[in-house]
């Protein structure tokens, strides 16, 4: 709130890929006073499995969208018409497949996290959404490799 001239760009591409009862919340929902200076970006690649289709969208104050449109129209061609039609169909069509895909992603997440946490010196927190994990190798620092070298840092670990 200290810097009202600063715009906030919120990438909400993973909003539908959440697990274990976690609910996605936008920044503007958490702090409504930020609504008028928040640009929310999203796309079709993650939840709708349309990677490579290059379909995205954003919500922002009208005057900013107008300026963004002027800039975009001068430097980037449009998304293919078939991709646009597919995106509209995906957004307006049945959404039950998202839950099925999330169950598959959750199963994979649980397996990866479990296996990482079984590895000596590795720890990994369970992510609440998306499909990325961020394991820590801190528990290996100071240990020896099978070749007898001491692991001094993350680069030695790799």
Regions flagged by a language model, labelled:
Residues 1-158:
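PLP-dependent class I/II
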């Amino acid at each position: 709130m200290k810097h009202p001239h600063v715009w906030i760009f919120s990438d909400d591409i993973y909003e539908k890929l959440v697990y274990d009862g976690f609910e996605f919340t936008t920044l503007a929902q958490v702090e409504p006073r930020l609504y008028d200076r928040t640009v929310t970006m999203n796309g079709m690649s993650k939840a709708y499995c349309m990677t490579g289709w290059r379909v995205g969208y954003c919500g922002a104050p009208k005057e900013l969208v107008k300026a963004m449109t002027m800039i975009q129209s001068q430097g980037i061609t449009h998304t293919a018409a078939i991709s646009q039609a597919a995106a509209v169909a995906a957004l307006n069509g049945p959404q039950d497949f998202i839950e099925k895909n999330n169950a598959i992603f959750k199963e994979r997440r649980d397996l990866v996290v479990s296996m990482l946490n079984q590895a000596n010196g590795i720890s990994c927190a369970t992510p609440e959404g998306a499909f990325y994990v961020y394991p820590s190798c801190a528990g290996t620092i100071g240990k020896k490799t099978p070749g007898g070298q001491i692991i001094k840092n993350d680069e030695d670990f790799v």
